[in-house]
Regions:
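Conserved active-site/ligand-binding neighborhood in enzyme cores
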Residues: 1-299
Protein backbone atom coordinates (compact mmCIF):
# COMPACT_ATOMS: atom_id res chain seq x y z
CA UNK A 1 0.00 0.00 0.00
CA UNK A 2 1.46 3.34 -1.07
CA UNK A 3 0.25 6.56 0.57
CA UNK A 4 1.29 10.20 0.27
CA UNK A 5 0.86 12.97 2.85
CA UNK A 6 1.38 16.70 2.32
CA UNK A 7 2.43 19.04 5.13
CA UNK A 8 1.21 22.63 4.73
CA UNK A 9 3.22 24.79 7.17
CA UNK A 10 1.38 27.14 9.53
CA UNK A 11 4.51 28.49 11.27
CA UNK A 12 8.27 28.75 10.70
CA UNK A 13 10.52 25.70 11.16
CA UNK A 14 13.83 25.47 12.98
CA UNK A 15 15.27 23.53 10.02
CA UNK A 16 14.11 21.58 6.98
CA UNK A 17 12.70 18.26 8.26
CA UNK A 18 14.54 15.01 7.52
CA UNK A 19 13.42 11.40 7.23
CA UNK A 20 14.28 10.90 10.88
CA UNK A 21 12.26 13.99 11.89
CA UNK A 22 9.17 12.37 10.37
CA UNK A 23 9.95 8.99 11.95
CA UNK A 24 10.46 10.65 15.34
CA UNK A 25 7.10 12.41 15.06
CA UNK A 26 5.43 9.08 14.28
CA UNK A 27 7.13 7.36 17.22
CA UNK A 28 6.16 10.06 19.72
CA UNK A 29 2.66 10.05 18.29
CA UNK A 30 2.40 6.29 18.88
CA UNK A 31 3.54 6.75 22.47
CA UNK A 32 1.09 9.59 23.17
CA UNK A 33 -1.92 8.32 21.21
CA UNK A 34 -1.48 4.61 21.93
CA UNK A 35 0.99 3.53 24.61
CA UNK A 36 4.67 3.02 25.34
CA UNK A 37 4.12 -0.72 24.89
CA UNK A 38 2.82 -0.15 21.36
CA UNK A 39 5.86 2.01 20.59
CA UNK A 40 8.30 -0.63 21.88
CA UNK A 41 6.45 -3.29 19.89
CA UNK A 42 6.73 -1.16 16.74
CA UNK A 43 10.43 -0.45 17.28
CA UNK A 44 11.05 -4.17 17.76
CA UNK A 45 9.54 -4.81 14.33
CA UNK A 46 12.00 -2.35 12.79
CA UNK A 47 14.96 -3.73 14.78
CA UNK A 48 14.28 -7.32 13.71
CA UNK A 49 13.94 -6.54 10.00
CA UNK A 50 10.13 -6.51 9.83
CA UNK A 51 9.31 -2.81 9.28
CA UNK A 52 5.54 -2.25 9.06
CA UNK A 53 6.21 0.78 6.83
CA UNK A 54 9.03 2.81 5.28
CA UNK A 55 9.03 6.54 4.59
CA UNK A 56 10.68 8.78 2.02
CA UNK A 57 12.61 11.91 2.84
CA UNK A 58 10.43 15.04 2.96
CA UNK A 59 9.90 16.11 -0.65
CA UNK A 60 8.95 19.66 -1.69
CA UNK A 61 5.42 19.80 -3.09
CA UNK A 62 5.08 22.75 -5.44
CA UNK A 63 1.68 23.58 -6.93
CA UNK A 64 0.57 19.96 -6.83
CA UNK A 65 3.87 18.73 -8.34
CA UNK A 66 6.36 16.54 -6.49
CA UNK A 67 10.02 17.58 -6.35
CA UNK A 68 12.68 14.90 -5.76
CA UNK A 69 16.35 14.98 -4.72
CA UNK A 70 18.69 15.21 -7.70
CA UNK A 71 19.67 11.67 -8.74
CA UNK A 72 23.41 11.18 -8.32
CA UNK A 73 24.97 9.82 -11.51
CA UNK A 74 28.29 10.21 -13.28
CA UNK A 75 27.69 12.08 -16.51
CA UNK A 76 30.72 12.70 -18.68
CA UNK A 77 30.46 16.35 -19.67
CA UNK A 78 33.39 18.19 -21.28
CA UNK A 79 32.70 21.95 -21.37
CA UNK A 80 33.81 23.41 -24.70
CA UNK A 81 33.40 27.07 -23.79
CA UNK A 82 32.63 29.40 -20.90
CA UNK A 83 28.86 29.04 -21.28
CA UNK A 84 29.12 25.24 -21.18
CA UNK A 85 31.25 25.50 -18.04
CA UNK A 86 28.69 27.76 -16.34
CA UNK A 87 25.92 25.30 -17.17
CA UNK A 88 28.01 22.45 -15.81
CA UNK A 89 28.63 24.29 -12.52
CA UNK A 90 24.92 25.04 -12.26
CA UNK A 91 24.16 21.35 -12.78
CA UNK A 92 26.68 20.30 -10.09
CA UNK A 93 25.03 22.62 -7.56
CA UNK A 94 21.49 21.44 -8.31
CA UNK A 95 19.74 19.78 -5.37
CA UNK A 96 16.23 19.13 -6.62
CA UNK A 97 14.52 17.97 -9.81
CA UNK A 98 10.90 17.44 -10.80
CA UNK A 99 9.33 13.97 -10.57
CA UNK A 100 9.20 13.92 -14.37
CA UNK A 101 12.99 14.32 -14.57
CA UNK A 102 13.57 11.76 -11.81
CA UNK A 103 11.24 9.33 -13.57
CA UNK A 104 13.18 9.67 -16.85
CA UNK A 105 16.36 8.83 -14.94
CA UNK A 106 14.71 5.61 -13.74
CA UNK A 107 13.53 4.75 -17.25
CA UNK A 108 16.87 5.18 -19.02
CA UNK A 109 20.44 5.95 -18.03
CA UNK A 110 21.02 9.72 -18.09
CA UNK A 111 23.53 11.09 -20.58
CA UNK A 112 23.08 14.82 -20.07
CA UNK A 113 22.56 17.28 -17.21
CA UNK A 114 19.24 17.68 -15.41
CA UNK A 115 17.04 20.74 -15.23
CA UNK A 116 16.89 21.94 -11.64
CA UNK A 117 13.61 22.55 -9.82
CA UNK A 118 13.95 24.93 -6.88
CA UNK A 119 11.58 24.71 -3.89
CA UNK A 120 10.59 27.91 -2.13
CA UNK A 121 12.44 28.23 1.17
CA UNK A 122 12.71 31.63 2.85
CA UNK A 123 15.01 32.35 5.77
CA UNK A 124 14.08 34.79 8.50
CA UNK A 125 15.69 36.05 11.68
CA UNK A 126 13.80 36.29 14.97
CA UNK A 127 15.32 38.50 17.73
CA UNK A 128 15.34 37.16 21.29
CA UNK A 129 16.42 38.48 24.68
CA UNK A 130 18.12 36.15 27.15
CA UNK A 131 16.07 35.82 30.34
CA UNK A 132 17.47 35.69 33.87
CA UNK A 133 15.48 32.79 35.33
CA UNK A 134 16.22 33.86 38.93
CA UNK A 135 14.82 37.37 38.61
CA UNK A 136 12.47 36.55 35.71
CA UNK A 137 13.65 39.65 33.87
CA UNK A 138 15.82 40.43 30.86
CA UNK A 139 18.15 42.55 33.01
CA UNK A 140 21.68 41.43 32.27
CA UNK A 141 20.46 39.39 29.33
CA UNK A 142 21.80 39.68 25.83
CA UNK A 143 19.99 40.20 22.57
CA UNK A 144 20.53 37.39 20.08
CA UNK A 145 19.04 36.35 16.75
CA UNK A 146 17.66 32.98 15.74
CA UNK A 147 17.49 31.85 12.12
CA UNK A 148 14.25 30.12 11.07
CA UNK A 149 12.83 28.79 7.81
CA UNK A 150 9.51 29.54 6.16
CA UNK A 151 8.83 26.47 4.07
CA UNK A 152 6.44 25.91 1.21
CA UNK A 153 4.39 22.70 1.28
CA UNK A 154 6.26 19.41 1.38
CA UNK A 155 5.21 15.77 1.52
CA UNK A 156 6.32 12.23 2.28
CA UNK A 157 5.62 8.95 0.53
CA UNK A 158 4.87 6.02 2.86
CA UNK A 159 5.01 2.38 1.79
CA UNK A 160 2.98 0.20 4.17
CA UNK A 161 3.80 -3.49 4.52
CA UNK A 162 1.24 -3.79 7.33
CA UNK A 163 -1.97 -1.98 6.37
CA UNK A 164 -3.15 -1.80 9.99
CA UNK A 165 -0.54 0.91 10.63
CA UNK A 166 -1.94 3.30 8.00
CA UNK A 167 -4.60 5.01 10.18
CA UNK A 168 -2.19 5.15 13.13
CA UNK A 169 0.62 6.77 11.13
CA UNK A 170 -1.80 9.33 9.69
CA UNK A 171 -3.17 10.13 13.16
CA UNK A 172 0.36 10.54 14.54
CA UNK A 173 1.34 12.95 11.77
CA UNK A 174 -1.86 14.97 12.27
CA UNK A 175 -1.13 15.17 16.00
CA UNK A 176 2.58 16.01 16.00
CA UNK A 177 4.77 19.02 15.32
CA UNK A 178 8.11 18.78 13.53
CA UNK A 179 11.61 19.88 14.47
CA UNK A 180 12.98 22.08 17.21
CA UNK A 181 11.45 24.84 19.37
CA UNK A 182 7.97 23.32 19.48
CA UNK A 183 7.25 25.14 22.74
CA UNK A 184 7.54 28.48 20.92
CA UNK A 185 5.09 27.40 18.23
CA UNK A 186 7.50 26.27 15.52
CA UNK A 187 6.96 23.24 13.31
CA UNK A 188 3.16 23.52 13.04
CA UNK A 189 1.36 22.42 9.89
CA UNK A 190 -1.88 21.10 8.43
CA UNK A 191 -1.73 17.54 7.08
CA UNK A 192 -3.52 16.45 3.93
CA UNK A 193 -3.54 13.13 2.11
CA UNK A 194 -2.87 13.23 -1.63
CA UNK A 195 -1.94 10.95 -4.52
CA UNK A 196 1.62 9.59 -4.84
CA UNK A 197 3.58 10.67 -7.92
CA UNK A 198 2.06 9.19 -11.06
CA UNK A 199 3.69 5.91 -12.09
CA UNK A 200 5.88 5.69 -8.98
CA UNK A 201 4.55 2.33 -7.82
CA UNK A 202 5.91 0.46 -10.85
CA UNK A 203 9.47 1.52 -9.93
CA UNK A 204 8.91 -0.05 -6.50
CA UNK A 205 7.34 -3.33 -7.62
CA UNK A 206 9.49 -3.94 -10.75
CA UNK A 207 12.88 -4.48 -9.16
CA UNK A 208 16.39 -4.50 -10.64
CA UNK A 209 19.97 -4.45 -9.35
CA UNK A 210 20.25 -0.64 -9.48
CA UNK A 211 18.26 1.57 -7.15
CA UNK A 212 17.94 5.28 -6.42
CA UNK A 213 17.28 6.00 -2.73
CA UNK A 214 14.71 8.63 -1.79
CA UNK A 215 15.46 8.59 1.93
CA UNK A 216 18.48 8.72 4.23
CA UNK A 217 19.97 5.23 4.41
CA UNK A 218 22.54 3.49 6.58
CA UNK A 219 25.08 1.26 4.83
CA UNK A 220 23.69 -2.13 3.83
CA UNK A 221 25.88 -5.20 3.07
CA UNK A 222 23.81 -5.62 -0.09
CA UNK A 223 25.36 -2.44 -1.54
CA UNK A 224 28.21 -2.69 -4.05
CA UNK A 225 29.64 0.74 -3.33
CA UNK A 226 32.45 0.39 -5.89
CA UNK A 227 29.80 0.52 -8.61
CA UNK A 228 27.54 3.09 -6.97
CA UNK A 229 27.27 6.89 -6.97
CA UNK A 230 26.40 8.47 -3.63
CA UNK A 231 26.91 11.28 -1.14
CA UNK A 232 27.56 10.71 2.56
CA UNK A 233 26.31 12.90 5.37
CA UNK A 234 27.87 12.81 8.86
CA UNK A 235 25.68 14.04 11.73
CA UNK A 236 25.53 14.39 15.50
CA UNK A 237 21.99 15.73 16.00
CA UNK A 238 19.89 16.40 19.07
CA UNK A 239 17.37 13.82 20.22
CA UNK A 240 13.74 14.28 19.14
CA UNK A 241 12.63 13.93 22.73
CA UNK A 242 9.08 15.19 22.87
CA UNK A 243 9.46 18.53 24.70
CA UNK A 244 11.83 17.13 27.36
CA UNK A 245 15.52 17.81 28.00
CA UNK A 246 18.01 18.20 25.13
CA UNK A 247 20.31 15.21 24.59
CA UNK A 248 22.84 14.70 21.79
CA UNK A 249 23.12 11.48 19.82
CA UNK A 250 26.38 9.76 18.94
CA UNK A 251 27.94 10.58 15.56
CA UNK A 252 26.77 8.52 12.59
CA UNK A 253 26.80 8.70 8.80
CA UNK A 254 24.46 7.62 6.03
CA UNK A 255 23.87 7.82 2.30
CA UNK A 256 21.81 10.85 1.32
CA UNK A 257 18.57 10.88 -0.70
CA UNK A 258 19.29 10.74 -4.42
CA UNK A 259 22.14 8.26 -3.99
CA UNK A 260 22.36 5.56 -6.64
CA UNK A 261 23.38 2.09 -5.45
CA UNK A 262 24.23 -1.15 -7.19
CA UNK A 263 22.59 -3.89 -5.11
CA UNK A 264 23.41 -7.59 -4.92
CA UNK A 265 19.82 -8.56 -4.13
CA UNK A 266 16.74 -6.47 -5.05
CA UNK A 267 14.67 -5.87 -1.89
CA UNK A 268 11.81 -3.71 -0.64
CA UNK A 269 14.15 -1.70 1.58
CA UNK A 270 17.76 -1.38 2.70
CA UNK A 271 19.61 -0.18 5.79
CA UNK A 272 17.75 -0.22 9.11
CA UNK A 273 17.42 1.63 12.39
CA UNK A 274 20.42 1.95 14.71
CA UNK A 275 20.84 2.58 18.41
CA UNK A 276 22.74 5.88 18.52
CA UNK A 277 22.49 6.61 22.26
CA UNK A 278 21.87 4.69 25.45
CA UNK A 279 21.26 6.42 28.78
CA UNK A 280 20.47 3.98 31.56
CA UNK A 281 17.43 2.00 30.48
CA UNK A 282 16.62 4.43 27.64
CA UNK A 283 17.73 3.64 24.08
CA UNK A 284 17.58 6.19 21.27
CA UNK A 285 17.30 5.02 17.66
CA UNK A 286 18.06 6.71 14.36
CA UNK A 287 16.00 5.93 11.26
CA UNK A 288 18.13 4.95 8.29
CA UNK A 289 15.96 2.73 6.10
CA UNK A 290 16.50 3.32 2.41
CA UNK A 291 13.38 3.68 0.25
CA UNK A 292 14.49 2.37 -3.18
CA UNK A 293 13.13 3.17 -6.62
CA UNK A 294 14.55 0.71 -9.14
CA UNK A 295 15.99 1.69 -12.52
CA UNK A 296 14.71 -0.09 -15.62
CA UNK A 297 17.99 0.23 -17.51
CA UNK A 298 19.81 -2.35 -15.40
CA UNK A 299 18.50 -5.81 -14.58
Amino acid sequence: MLKAFVFKPLSPFKSFPTTNTIFGAICWGIRWLESEEKLLETLEMFKTGRPPFIISAPLPWKGGRWIFPRPIHFIRIVPENVEDYKEYKKFKKAQWVSWEVFKKTLEREPERSFEEEKPQINKDVIPHASINRLTMTTVGGELYNEEVYWLSSFGVIVKFFDGSFEPLVKACLEFSQLGGNKTTGMGRYRLEETKPPEGMEEFISQKSTRAFLISDCFYDPEFDLNNSFYDIKVQKPAVENGLTKRVWKNTFCYLTPGSQVQVKTPKDWYGGIKEVLKEGSISVYQYGIGFPLFARWEK
